[in-house]
Amino acid sequence: MGHIPQTDCQARPAMPVSLRNKTRWPATMAMIAFCILLSACRNTDPDAFTRVQAWPLPTTSTPSAQPDLVVTPSDELLLSWVEPTETQHRLQLSRFQPVDATPRWAPTRTVASGKGWFLNWADTPHVYALEDGSLWAHWLRSTGPGRMDYGIDLVRSGDGGKSWSEPHMVNLGNSLGDHGFVTFWQQANDQLGMAWLDSRQRAVMGSMAKGESHQHGAGDHDHHGKDAMMLRGALFNASVRQQGEWPLDASTCDCCPTSSAVTDRGTVVVYRGRSANEIRDTRLVRFDGKTWTSPRDVHADSWQIAGCPVNGPVVVAKGNTLWVVWYTEADGAPELRAARSQDAGDTFAAPVTLAKGPQVLGRASLALADEHVLVAWLEQSQDDSQRLVLGRYDHALQNPRQVEIAQLATRGRASGMPRLRVANGSAWLVWTDVQSGQPIVRGASIH
């Protein structure tokens, strides 16, 4: 089997280390079922979300990478990942039903396969489920001669993933430049909202220099103003036809993932902004269904950095309460911060430090439970290996408790972006590790 190609931002994986307390599939699934039933019977549990179990995934073949994990309106879980074939790549999808007495995976389905995909450790495909039962997915496809010319292919399934629409290129006209770092939300029962980072204005500037290649890496992002990446948003109907598109911010960080959540006052999108003097702090915009607010800072960290840190913010919401988690080095050291808003993002309380020090890698994922806020992030060990950590907090971001989820064999950026979700009273977490020198997606359930 072929390997998943890596961009120049990636580091090759090292020798594998298995998840701690690895068990056989039947025993593990039985334990998961027991913990689910147990958690349903408890109103308050001082040890909630500290009991870690291996979660067997359908990603049994290697290599597999770039996982995404989402909760459906029926409280099921959708897991997607990318794996290679002999000549191309395919986006795989499976559904997990944690609500049953015996949790199980549905048969894996292929969303799409093809050549010429753009695969990157941070800019990964996403899946989503709307209340009308439809499933949506996207991946990145090369669109031009340059390595960084790629666009967003969007598809929809109305039959549970058995069949999919023809891919729709979100950036119309197959415009050159890079377009990615997508976030999805439900705008209506049958309407998908999405936001992404878009380089059309930078591509126009670049085209003025004939023959100049359009490249970017972790330290190459030194543009701003009309030569900067921008944030755009759009809505799509059940026919995968665009029903509006908006420029949301004309100057953003180049390759930090975006995130979104729905409040009672509309959808909030968070992302890393970029000022003319290279201040790259977390910003927020909100959409009420008709208009978008102007960008505003979640907090004025005043982190000045000439290159993109590839470390975007994440957000969850309930009612008009928002929680945002982000990475910064504004005080001279790697730090993971969180802040809460109780007015749908108009104002935020002072940020809380979740983790700080040279070991903090960030790449946070965020989920909300009935009584807790859960945050997963990566840290680096002294031997350059990595570990995956889960932090549990109350809704005021107080009373912290941390638990180690796994020791990873992979190093650098090959570990990708962890994905954390809460469904049926338990937390579910997936990430990329290595096995026999190849990337593989692993999982854990936390009860």
Locations of regions flagged by a protein language model:
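Exposed, low-complexity/repetitive linear segments and helix-based recognition motifs
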Residues: P5-T7, G219
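Extracellular, repeat-based ectodomains that mediate carbohydrate processing or recognition
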Residues: R42-H447
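C-terminal motif of bacterial Sec signal peptides marking the signal peptidase cleavage site
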Residues: L37-A40
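Bacterial N-terminal signal peptides that target proteins for export
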Residues: T7-R12, P16-A30
